[in-house]
C-alpha cells in the first residue's frame, strides 16, 4: 500500500515517481524469464473460481486492497491484513500461495507476488464472464506493510460520495474510474455488519422490499458475518447489473447507493446501466490505472520466495 503525501509538493513528487515506475512495466516482462507465468496464473485462478465462484470476487477485492499501492503488501501475514477494512474479510491468500509455489518450481524467484495478484484479478473477471485487458508486468514485492495506511487510504462501506471521490483522487483516479471500479460489486458478497445500518433505517434511499428481504439473514443484533450478494440479479456473473440495481435503489452498501442519489455521478451510473460496453471499457481502463499505482520496479523491494513473508 502506497503512502499518502504530506503536502502538495510531495504529492507531485509521488505522482511523478509513480508515473516513472509504471513506465518501467511491460506486458512482455516474463516472456523470456518465465514464459509460462501467465498460463500458470490463469489455470490456478480458473480452478479456484470453478470450485468456488465467490473466489473470483475475493481475488479482485484482494487486488483492490493491495493496489492503493500495488506491492503485495496485503499478502504479508499480519500488519495490513489486520487493518479495519481487511480484518476478517479478505480471502484468496491460499490461491495466490498455490500459484506462487507452482511458479517457484519452474521459475525460481522470478515472478513477483504483486504481479501474480494483479494478473489473478484480471483472470478472475474473465472467468466470470467479464472483459479482459493487457496487464503491464514487472512489479516487485514490498518488504513492509502498514495497517495504519490501509485504515487511512481504503474507502469503507459507509463512505459518502465525497469521501469516495477524495480517496480515489488521492490515488490519481478520477470520478469515472471510481464509478467503474465500484462496478466490481457486480460479484461477491458483503457481511451483515457492513449493511445493517442501511437496512434498518439508516438510509432512506433503499427499496423497501429489498431492505425487508435482507433482514431475514441480517438481524438487528448478531449475525455480523452473515453474507448477502452485492448483486442480487446475477451474483456470479461479471456484468453491468450492479448499476441497474442502483437505479432501483437496490445497492447493498451505503457506499454503493451514494453513486446514484441525486449526485454528480448519476449520469455515469445511468450510462453504465444501459451500455455494458461503456462499463467494460471504463472498467478495464480504471483497472490498468489502479494496477499502476506506485509499483516497486527495478531494484526496489524484492521478489518474495513466499507471498506471506519477506525473504530472510
From Swiss-Prot:
Residues 1-23 form the signal peptide. GO terms for molecular function: heme binding; lactoperoxidase activity; metal ion binding. Ca(2+) 2 binds at residues 186, 231, 234, 239. The modification Pyrrolidone carboxylic acid is found at residue 24. GO terms for cellular component: extracellular region. InterPro entries: Haem_peroxidase (IPR002016), Haem_peroxidase_sf (IPR010255), Peroxidase_pln (IPR000823), Peroxidases_AS (IPR019794), Peroxidases_heam-ligand_BS (IPR019793), Secretory_peroxidase (IPR033905). The record marks 61 as: Transition state stabilizer. Binds 2 calcium ions per subunit. Keywords: Calcium, Disulfide bond, Glycoprotein, Heme, Hydrogen peroxide, Iron, Metal-binding, Oxidoreductase, Peroxidase, Pyrrolidone carboxylic acid, Secreted, Signal. The active site is at residue 65. CDD domains: secretory_peroxidase (cd00693). Its cofactor is Ca(2+); heme b. Glycans are attached at residue 262. Ca(2+) 1 binds at residues 66, 69, 71, 73. Root. The keyword Cytoplasm does not apply. Substrate binds at residue 155. Its EC number is 1.11.1.7. Heme b binds at residue 185. One of its GO terms (biological process) is hydrogen peroxide catabolic process. It is found in: Secreted. Disulfide bonds join 34-107, 67-70, 113-307, 192-218. It catalyses: 2 a phenolic donor + H2O2 = 2 a phenolic radical donor + 2 H2O. Belongs to the peroxidase family. Classical plant (class III) peroxidase subfamily. Removal of H(2)O(2), oxidation of toxic reductants, biosynthesis and degradation of lignin, suberization, auxin catabolism, response to environmental stresses such as wounding, pathogen attack and oxidative stress. These functions might be dependent on each isozyme/isoform in each plant tissue. Involved in defense response to powdery meldew fungus. This is Peroxidase. It comes from Triticum aestivum.
